[in-house]
Amino acid sequence: MIEASKLKAGMTFETADGKLIRVLEASHHKPGKGNTIMRMKLRDVRTGSTFDTSYRPEEKFEQAIIETVPAQYLYQMDDTAYFMNTETYDQYEIPVVNVEEELKFILENSDVKIQFYGTEVIGVTVPTTVELVVTDTQPSIKGATVTGSGKPATLETGLVVNVPDFIEVGQKLIINTAEGTYVSRA
């Protein structure tokens, strides 16, 4: 059992009614009067629906035991993403709604880890950083300094991140997948 106050983004737990829930965001909130509450943005792993809720910090949940296996992202067709276990060569189909955040960071043939709850495929874990190429951004301005606020850049997966002014189209960048932010040039 795990208390609500210990839940963090990325953790998965099971509710009393058998729903498998993944934490997308979690924060402590202390109202002016009353007790602290945990505000959370959650995703039902099986249906892909997201919802906001709050719990008392002492509420307990059954932590789900998740196993991971190395895999490769193959392709996406319609509403399904296809992955292959790199050890057994088994292929898995995962609804895009369950992995849409992760797909922003991976290209075809990228290495990932598939998450299992028992025999059920429930999601994908991407590396902590990835290298992606800039496909669209405003032109660089001569004399631009690093101290500027930056500019938006669209990457080859469609992800838009804020980058320094000196970044140009065609450059390869290192992106932090946990925060979806620019780290450095590759």
From Swiss-Prot:
Record's GO cellular component terms: cytoplasm
Disulphide bridges, residue numbers: none
Domain of life where this protein originates: Bacteria
Family matches, as Pfam families: EFP, EFP_N, Elong-fact-P_C
SUPFAM superfamilies xref list: Nucleic acid-binding proteins, Translation proteins SH3-like domain
Biological pathway: Protein biosynthesis; polypeptide chain elongation
GO molecular function annotations of the record: translation elongation factor activity
Keywords for this protein: Cytoplasm, Elongation factor, Protein biosynthesis
InterPro entries the record matches: Elong-fact-P_C, NA-bd_OB-fold, Rib_uL2_dom2, Transl_elong_fac_P/YeiP, Transl_elong_KOW-like, Transl_elong_P/YeiP_cen, Transl_elong_P/YeiP_CS, Transl_elongation_fac_P
BP term (GO), one: peptide biosynthetic process
Keyword Heme: no
Cellular location(s): Cytoplasm
Role played: Involved in peptide bond synthesis. Stimulates efficient translation and peptide-bond synthesis on native or reconstituted 70S ribosomes in vitro. Probably functions indirectly by altering the affinity of the ribosome for aminoacyl-tRNA, thus increasing their reactivity as acceptors for peptidyl transferase.
Family classification: Belongs to the elongation factor P family.
Name the UniProt record assigns to this protein: Elongation factor P
